[in-house]
Amino acid sequence: QKNYQEINSKINYCNSIKEWIEIYKILTYWELEISQIDNNDIYEIIESQKKEANRLFGTFIEENYKNILLDNDIDLSHTLFKNKVIPELSSERPTLMILIDNLRYDQWKCLEPDIISDYKVTVNEIYSSIIPTTTQYSRNSIFSGLSPIEINKKHSELWKNENDEGGKNLFEKLLLKEQLVRLGKNISFNYHKVINTKEGIKYYEKLENEKQNDLSVLVYNFVDMISHAKKDVNFIKELAKDDKAYRSLTLSWYNNSNLKKIITKAKELGHKIIITTDHGTINVNTPSLVSGDKEISTNLRYKTAKKINSETKKVIKIDDPSSFLLPSNYLSSCFIFAKENTYFVYSNNYNNYVNMFKNTYQHGGVSLEEMLVPFVVIKPK
């Protein structure tokens, strides 16, 4: 009862990202503790607190995001590499940076005991993704060290707009190389992306060769694949019906994954290991009708177009994308971002889409789960 009241009080008086990070840590701690006991009543209490926290967090971001982008004391996607990764690099010991796409903080806390065993934790923090909380925006910003609008201006050939064909993250290695040059870091590095089991095995088998590099970057996409598959594959939807089940699925996957083998081998080889992500994800349950021109983007948690109409107040709308450091696809582009557990649907086939995407994991919007994500550094004892 006392903890409940203290948490409620802190939620109601949060007025900085750092305070929200501390609240999210507390909520996650209690959620994980309570999920281990079979008491739905208590679990529902912490869930209701998290729901209220997300409501207030959405309002906080709506009112303060422009200032957050200007605050040099806050670690964001486009400042993460310079502020957090570069200081960890050393010629004395190779560093393996593993970016697990779509890894939430609560998922990390479930994987943490196994991953940190036999190693010393030197950094165990949370940083904030920029919005939209998607791979295109967040991860390109991490590797470039630039905001999306800066990437578009400086490297227009490497930035694809919403409706351009082709992959949106095909130039991460090139963007990282350019960032290292810009920061004056003459280091040897390599970059790999694992999107299936075969590639995971291949990387594991040649990991020993990575010792010659000061920095090895590994983007591991499997958690993202689980998240996206949830809307398509019924058995995954059944396995990950809520956050508790989603964490369990993540842990089961990790314990049988090539990623676990890679981390174990990296420890044996004496690597310093950085573990982070580009954004998280949230279970969506509240449909919201949206309409726009024919070029409107497809993501369920944010939309951009020349003109957008939405029915709910659970959105953040901006008519000047540059104020959020975002490029404009058109002269009159605008963005809307879903808050809380909302997802956008069109009037065409409304009921079909509502049922298809209800209780699925989506990202791109504004929530604690999507924006506040782990950054961890471990090294040999």
Residue spans for each PLM region:
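Feature captures the catalytic ectodomains and active-site-proximal regions of enzymes
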Residues: 1-381
